[in-house]
Design a protein with these regions (language model features):
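Amphipathic alpha-helical assembly segments used for oligomerization, scaffolding, or translocation
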Residues: 1-200
Length: 200
């Protein structure tokens, strides 16, 4: 009898260990999926923050065509997972690959749209003068122009960085507006007589 009792206890322990091992594997599989989704969540959150900042500062944003479709896929995946919280629920068939492909497409299209929206806004609403080298080529080399050109170069260097790297805060937008105003305010001496221009 003692042997039967020991065997029964051993079987029960083995069953508990098996359940623990299966639970550990399931937890590992779910963690892997969570990490993958967290990367998309970080990207989407960053784009949402920059979109909100753009909107607050008057940048017109284009609609992203895949947004509603992707939201629906995420919602369906969540509902399925809440009914059966296992990694296999998410990975069944092509659900996971379809979901991640939609998220990747959404992130890519949103980045492209925001970049284009920023480029248009920058060109339409900020200083549109010539780069310093081109501006210098049109000026007589008077002391006044040299001083103005030096200031122009300094401001333009800080200003032009925003063309490809949009502001990331309200303070950056304020700085950009100030740079644009300062560049616009710089006046060059352009009415130099031709004889003086040749001499300089």
């Amino acid at each position: 009898m003692a042997l039967l009792a020991d065997a029964t206890k051993t079987c029960e322990r083995l069953q508990i260990l098996r359940t623990i091992a299966e639970g550990a594997e399931e937890a590992k599989a779910i963690e892997s999926l969570r990490v993958e989704l967290a990367e998309f969540a970080t990207s989407v959150n960053g784009l949402a923050c920059s979109g909100a900042l753009f909107h607050e500062n008057g940048v017109s944003l284009s609609a992203v065509s895949d947004l509603a479709n992707t939201q629906e896929s995420v919602q369906k995946s969540l509902e399925r997972f809440l009914k059966a919280p296992k990694a296999t629920t998410l990975r069944q068939g092509t659900r996971w690959t379809t979901l991640t492909a939609k998220l990747e497409t959404l992130v890519d299209k949103t980045k492209v749209a925001q970049s284009g929206d920023w480029q248009r806004h920058f060109e339409q609403h900020f200083f549109g003068g010539l780069p310093p080298a081109k501006r210098e080529a049109t000026l007589a080399k008077t002391p006044e122009n040299e001083r103005a050109l030096k200031r122009y170069r300094e401001l333009y260097q800080s200003f032009i960085q925003y063309r490809t790297k949009p502001p990331t805060s309200a303070e950056d937008f304020q700085k950009l507006h100030l740079l644009s105003q300062q560049l616009t305010a710089i006046k060059f001496q352009e009415d130099v007589p031709e004889a003086v221009r040749k001499f300089l």
